[in-house]
Design a protein with these regions (language model features):
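A C-terminal-region feature
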Residues: 1-50
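Short, hydrophobic/proline-enriched secondary-structure or compact coil segments at domain edges
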Residues: 2, 51-59, 137-147, 287
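N-terminal alpha-helical "arm" segments
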Residues: 38-72
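N-terminal low-complexity, intrinsically disordered segments
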Residues: 59-131
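Short acidic, S/G/P-rich loop/turn micro-motifs used as interaction or catalytic elements
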Residues: 62-64, 147-151, 239-240
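Structural alpha-beta junctions
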Residues: 74-82, 162-176, 252-262
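Internal, hydrophobic cores of structured domains that mediate oligomerization or house catalytic pockets
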Residues: 103, 107-206
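Aromatic/basic-lined ligand-recognition segments
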Residues: 180-287
């Protein structure tokens, strides 16, 4: 089933990861602890808006930090400056500032627990080896972006740049984020869209596809990180590529223009291509 997600490691590891790498100037743990407690008390899920985190699967528990620093400069013209020599450094972790954002990259020398990466790899219908690669990974790199930057798209861009640079690591075999495991060359290639001033929509959002008795269905996964609702198209009479491209165009429009789709309105990308918008509980990704 396409929507069989299990993103527990992403949620459970993120807070621990941040606590270990926090920088007081950019991240106030006391303030965020209150948010977590309030959400728990209300019995609601924590708001994921602006929380960019993911994992680079590795076939061996090693990474080349110096290479990563070189790749960030070569690929994105971002100079990585670690904290000064008076502060303790960790060969397995790297924390640096980019404007008002904090980038954190850290090696974990063990697989993601409970077969979670393998389960989510099943959602990648575009990569035949996704499940096997996920099953065989032996370690992972945790990647996160946080800080005071208010423009969520800027945080998302930096996250994609970090993960794309990690794709060049010798032992990188997959990128686990947005509820799926991406092929590294796919992820890095689509991140290059940013060099043309385009949004890296295929790095941010997973466009799931599956068939039912009524036809082809498609859905987004990852819009919530940008403070937007997920979208789906149900029972479509369309080719998979057409449906995926439609959803990608729609997601790009919503994110780039900061649009909120309203129930009862119509949307389309040409005069003879109009679709009714219906707000309802999700079918592909039920609450």
């Amino acid at each position: 089933q396409e929507n069989d997600y299990k993103i527990t490691h992403l949620a459970d590891s993120f807070e621990e990861f941040v606590r270990g790498l926090e920088h007081e100037a950019l991240y106030d743990p006391d303030e965020n602890e209150g948010d977590f407690e309030e959400d728990d008390a209300d019995g609601e899920e924590t708001d994921r808006t602006g929380v960019f985190t993911g994992f680079v699967l590795l076939s061996k528990g090693e990474w080349d930090k110096d290479q990563f620093i070189r790749d960030m400069k070569e690929k994105w013209d971002i100079s990585v400056e670690e904290y000064d020599a008076s502060e303790e450094k960790d060969d397995d972790a790297l924390v640096f500032e980019v404007g008002d954002m904090l980038a954190a990259v850290s090696l974990a020398t063990y697989p993601i627990p409970d077969g979670e990466a393998e389960i989510n790899a099943e959602n990648n219908y575009m990569w035949e080896d996704a499940v096997q690669v996920a099953r065989e990974h032996r370690a992972h790199i945790m990647v996160a972006v946080l800080g005071k930057e208010k423009k969520v798209l800027e945080k998302g861009k930096l996250f994609a740049k970090l993960a794309a640079a990690c794709c060049r690591q010798q032992y990188a075999t997959g990128i686990y984020t947005s509820g799926v495991v991406f092929e590294p060359r796919f992820y890095e290639g689509f991140a290059d869209m940013m060099k043309e001033d385009e949004l890296p929509i295929f790095n941010w959002i997973w466009f799931g596809l599956y068939r039912s008795e009524g036809g082809l269905n498609g859905y987004t996964y990852g819009m919530d990180v940008f403070g937007k609702e997920e979208m789906e198209v149900l029972n479509a009479d369309a080719e998979p590529e057409k449906l995926r491209d439609f959803l990608a165009s729609l997601a790009s429009y919503v994110l780039a223009c900061d649009v909120t789709l309203k129930d009862g309105e119509t949307i389309g990308f040409s005069a003879d291509d109009k679709h009714a918008i219906i707000r309802s509980p999700g079918v592909s990704l039920p609450e």
